[in-house]
């Protein structure tokens, strides 16, 4: 019997079956580009049996459309765990019905989320030591940068998309938090964001 895995419970529940295996025996499907990159940075790419279509890998692996794939389509791959950033296409319910382990790791909204997710992935693929070293080095470098940051009254507008509308970032997003930490005035912080997504939509008039 496989068990449902959710981010906050991962470190406790994974020990029931998945983390008992050697890392090169764990079969991971990553439907999140960010977490594919984390796995590669921890030198655990041998765990990947499939990745989303935006992940860049230089080794043979099945490529999957994370927006449309169903749990039924993933089941024949026999994954030990599926990594998700979003619940596209109702896949979470499908994975639960198929009794396939999954980890839901939504986009990080601050540095602590980033560190926590790296360490979570490290635990998942038996690279705890590498994950700890990575987050330790990141904290040192980020603190050094922040200590030396001096942008005065600098303001910034960060546009992240135009194909489906004009979108920016506010302080509810990781990028927005970085700007806040640097002391930069982020213009989009004052833009309405009704869903609290961290990525407010702007009109062309607001953009100008």
Language-model features: where?
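Sec-dependent signal peptide recognition
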Residues: 1-8
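Extracytoplasmic substrate-binding proteins
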Residues: 20-27, 91-167, 188-190, 197-199
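A short, structured surface patch at a secondary-structure boundary
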Residues: 27-91, 100, 184-187
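Stable alpha-helical elements in mature extracytoplasmic
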Residues: 34-38, 44, 70, 87, ...
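His/Asp/Glu-enriched short active-site or ligand-binding loop at hydrolase and phosphoryl-transfer sites
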Residues: 52, 61-62, 174-198
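Short helix-initiation/N-cap motifs at beta->coil->alpha
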Residues: 63-72, 192-205
């Amino acid at each position: 019997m496989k068990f449902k895995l959710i981010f906050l419970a991962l470190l406790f529940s994974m020990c029931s079956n998945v983390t008992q295996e050697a890392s090169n025996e764990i079969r991971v499907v990553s439907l999140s580009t960010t977490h594919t990159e984390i796995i590669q940075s921890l030198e655990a790419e041998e765990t990947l049996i499939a990745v989303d279509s935006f992940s860049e890998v230089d080794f043979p692996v099945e490529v999957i459309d994370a927006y449309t794939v169903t749990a039924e389509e993933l089941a024949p791959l026999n994954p030990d765990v599926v990594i998700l950033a979003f619940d596209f296409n109702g896949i979470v319910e499908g994975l639960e019905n198929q009794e396939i382990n999954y980890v839901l790791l939504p986009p990080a909204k601050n540095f602590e989320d980033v560190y926590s997710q790296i360490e979570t992935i490290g635990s998942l693929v038996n690279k705890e030591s590498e994950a700890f070293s990575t987050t330790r080095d990141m904290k040192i470098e980020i603190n050094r940068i922040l200590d030396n940051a001096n942008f005065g009254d600098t303001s910034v507008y960060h546009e992240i998309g135009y194909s489906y509308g004009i979108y920016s970032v506010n302080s509810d997003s990781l990028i927005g938090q970085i700007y806040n930490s640097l002391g930069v005035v982020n213009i989009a912080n004052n833009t309405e964001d009704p869903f609290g997504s961290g990525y407010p939509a702007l009109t062309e008039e607001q953009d100008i």
